[in-house]
A protein has these predicted regions:
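Helix-to-loop junction immediately C-terminal to a conserved catalytic motif
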Residues: 56
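Conserved ABC transporter NBD signature motif
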Residues: 64-72, 79-80
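Catalytic Walker B motif of ABC-type/P-loop ATPase nucleotide-binding domains
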Residues: 157-161
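Conserved signature/switch motifs of ABC ATPase nucleotide-binding domains
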Residues: 151-152
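A short, surface-exposed alpha-helical micro-motif characterized by mixed small hydrophobic
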Residues: 199-201
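ABC ATPase "signature
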Residues: 217-218
Length: 245
């Protein structure tokens, strides 16, 4: 059965991931509604990357269940990934190709490719489109990956710390323009980020991971109303001061 009848794009139930004796995720449950901007927060090592790997069908859990559009991504990865755009934490592309060449290559592989839309986003991010990927800054590489991830009009966009290495102008473009634009169009966005101030006004729902467990999972507005504090202060109060967000 197609997952299109479900109200959730992503549903996670009691998900546990282990690496040897180390437990990376411990009975994690969450649900990402269609059209929502969902923020997953946590310190480095909290388990965010493990959850994303499961979501993308790259990691098989030790226990529990994860469904994407109603299907198991581990068993249905090719079909599901055609509906998903991904921006990894570490940008990766053929080093000798420019952004223009990468977009052209993607266009030859995907009939739904919006080359004009990709070019416009690269212009917004002020990326030199004829410069080889290996010569771009880390922030520029991330901007290229974001523009390419949106090129086929995905139903779900997965962003793994998309503003890391970006300057203020580019961060504002990612949060204010790209994520806001996608939310207005009804695209579901699943984002991990260290930029809590940037995501606070855009996320509909938020989960906080600590030690592989979900310690907060609720609507952003309800969370802020309950605590009567900014998101950064709530995060620190929940997980403590030590380490990077």
């Amino acid at each position: 059965m197609s997952g299109d009848v479900t109200p959730e794009v992503l549903a996670v139930r009691d998900l546990t991931v282990r690496y040897g004796r180390q437990v990376a995720l411990d009975a994690v449950s969450l649900a990402v509604p269609r059209g929502a901007v969902y923020a997953l927060l946590g310190r480095n090592g909290a388990g965010k990357s493990s959850l994303i790997r499961c979501l993308l069908g790259q990691q098989h859990p030790a226990r529990g269940r994860l469904s994407l559009f109603g299907l198991d991504p581990w068993r249905n990865r090719p079909a599901l990934m055609a509906r998903v755009g991904v921006v990894p934490e570490t940008p990766d592309a053929p080093p000798e190709l420019s952004a223009d060449q990468l977009s052209a290559l993607c266009g030859r592989l995907n009939r739904q490719w919006d080359r004009a839309g990709v070019a416009e986003r690269l212009r917004r991010f002020d990326v030199p489109v004829r410069t080889p990927f290996q010569r771009l800054s880390k922030g520029q590489k991330g901007a290229v990956m974001l523009a390419l991830a949106l090129g086929h009009g995905p139903e779900l966009l997965v962003l793994d710390d998309p503003t890391l290495g970006l300057d203020v102008v580019a961060r504002n473009a990612v949060f204010g323009e790209v994520i806001g634009e996608l939310a207005d169009r009804g695209t579901t966005v699943f984002v991990t980020t260290h930029d809590l101030a940037g995501i606070e006004g855009l996320a509909d729902r938020v989960a906080i991971l600590s030690g592989g467990r979900i310690v907060v999972e609720e609507e952003m507005d309800a969370l802020k109303a309950r605590w009567a504090r900014p998101l950064e202060e709530i995060f620190t109060a929940v997980v403590g001061e030590k380490g990077a967000a």
